[in-house]
């Protein structure tokens, strides 16, 4: 079985049971075989100091049969490997490798590097590889080093990938970083922790997908934490291929749920800028639900930070892929703290769209976005369902809360849906600046009813219209309420409501 990613700069890697190829490298018939050094005869331990291993792969334990690889370890200090692209064989560093068994408790420790131009070129760094069975409890610790090869805490060909940890500090990775990967199983409770580092491509806590088929499994309870660090795309957990980016195989999708994954991004350095493009708590590309995932940006009490180039942020999302229908995105959360500014950094094109939950062909219910003094360059949507030709869905029970000191560059929607119900959504604006109109719920072709909008504190809506509900064709009034509490100022217009409540105006001389 194999797995291929193709990203914006055409980086491609292929993983076979016997061959790793990265960044343009390829196997050549009759080419030289890499040399393998194993710790099988020394208790599963290998260490290297102040050396570059040329066309050589390192294994704590390596078993070419069904023997499990357990508690193997490779330790490199100011050392690395460099493998020519034309060589064949397993290319990289493995704490433990089992061709037909499980891999448990294996480790790779890397501190510093030796080969300055491209350490770990045409290689993979893998805590534990399981050809059959679970990859469980493996880890990579990568400190003050560089790698042009991908990092996997654990890889399972046909089993669960769980409880693996990748820790990166003060390093540069010009490839991808994955806590746990499986081609057919559950990626559960894996973790990636990155501090003071730069990752050029993708970071994933836990994932399941494979080329050529719709892999069946799940990504649950995985975690990613970035501190003072940059990446291109970040997923807490994912089922299926790369969201919105060609994989090179239209069926590189998944069938299963992405549930309970968490992504935290923060900076402890005041005035710093973190480059990120796409942020996902948990997503499904294929068929399945993305529920109860969470994204937290910023840290209370930390210095101000700009998260630059961000164009997409989902708490949880499910979209179609490979001819199979997506699923629901329910109960996801996004929290943006007061020290965070999100922008795309492209001049007049600035804008970041935020979705608490997004479902291409399913329900987007009970999602929540909270902006506590943060700054967002474009629109905010609590829950969104496209539905379209796939029939009706729901975008119900979603919540958006904006507190004082926040600024939103675009419109605010509690719930948004192409076809179906956008009802029982709740928007609370407690001060701040809103750059567009406010909709409790919006349905292209359906009802937007029983939504509530509450405005309090100091907020200028003189050029904004508040809609209890909006729709091209549907009921947009019944049960919709707008309330003003302890506030003052003006509103351009209020439309499509049943009940208007005004109490305790903060400034009666500037009453609504």
Report residues per predicted region.
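Bacterial Sec-dependent N-terminal signal peptides
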Residues: 1-22
């Amino acid at each position: 079985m194999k797995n291929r990613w193709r990203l914006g700069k055409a980086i491609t890697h292929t993983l076979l049971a016997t061959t790793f190829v990265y960044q343009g490298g390829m196997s050549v018939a009759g080419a030289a075989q890499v040399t393998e050094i194993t710790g099988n005869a020394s208790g599963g331990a290998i260490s290297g100091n102040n050396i570059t291993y040329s066309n050589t792969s390192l294994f704590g334990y390596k078993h070419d049969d069904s023997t499990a690889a357990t508690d193997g370890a490779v330790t490199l200090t100011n050392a690395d490997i460099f493998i020519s692209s034309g060589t064949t064989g397993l290319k990289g560093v493995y704490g433990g490798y089992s061709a037909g068994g499980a891999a448990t408790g294996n480790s790779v420790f890397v501190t510093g590097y030796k080969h300055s131009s491209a350490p770990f070129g045409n290689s993979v760094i893998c805590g534990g590889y399981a050809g059959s069975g679970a990859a469980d409890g493996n880890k990579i610790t990568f400190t003050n080093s560089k790698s042009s090869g991908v990092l996997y805490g654990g890889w399972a060909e046909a089993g669960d990938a769980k409880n693996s940890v990748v820790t990166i500090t003060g390093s540069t990775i010009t490839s991808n970083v994955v806590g746990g990967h499986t081609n057919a199983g559950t990626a559960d409770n894996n973790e990636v922790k990155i501090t003071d580092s730069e990752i050029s491509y993708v970071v994933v806590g836990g994932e399941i997908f494979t080329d050529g088929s719709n892999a069946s499994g799940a990504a649950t309870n995985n975690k990613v934490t970035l501190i003072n660090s940059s990446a291109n795309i970040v997923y807490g957990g994912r089922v299926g291929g790369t969201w919105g980016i060609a994989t090179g195989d239209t069926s590189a999708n998944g069938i299963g749920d992405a549930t309970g994954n968490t992504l935290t991004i923060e900076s402890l350095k005041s005035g710093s800028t973190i480059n990120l493009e796409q942020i996902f708590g948990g997503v499904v590309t294929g068929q399945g639900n993305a529920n109860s995932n969470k994204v937290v940006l910023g840290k209370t009490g930390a210095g101000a930070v700009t998260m630059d180039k961000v164009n997409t942020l989902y708490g949880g999302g499910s979209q179609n892929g490979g001819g199979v229908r997506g699923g629901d995105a329910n109960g996801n959360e996004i929290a943006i703290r007061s020290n965070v500014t999100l922008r795309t950094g492209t001049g007049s094109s600035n804008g970041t769209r935020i979705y608490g939950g997004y479902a291409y062909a399913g329900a987007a219910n009970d999602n929540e976005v909270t902006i506590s003094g943060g700054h967002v360059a474009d629109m905010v949507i609590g829950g969104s369902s496209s539905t379209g030709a796939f029939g009706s869905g729901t975008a119900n029970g979603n919540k958006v809360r904006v507190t004082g000191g926040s600024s939103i560059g675009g419109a605010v929607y509690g719930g948004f849906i192409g076809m179906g119900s956008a009802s029982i959504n709740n928007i609370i604006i407690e001060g701040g600046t809103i750059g567009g109109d406010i909709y409790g719920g919006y349905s292209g072709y359906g009802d937007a009813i029983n939504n509530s909008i509450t405005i309090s504190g100091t907020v200028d809506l003189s050029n904004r219209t508040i809609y209890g509900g909006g729709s091209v064709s549907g009921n947009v009034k019944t049960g919709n309420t707008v309330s003003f509490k302890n506030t003052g100022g003006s509103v351009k217009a209020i439309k499509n409501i049943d009940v208007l409540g005004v109490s305790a105006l903060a400034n009666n001389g500037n009453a609504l």
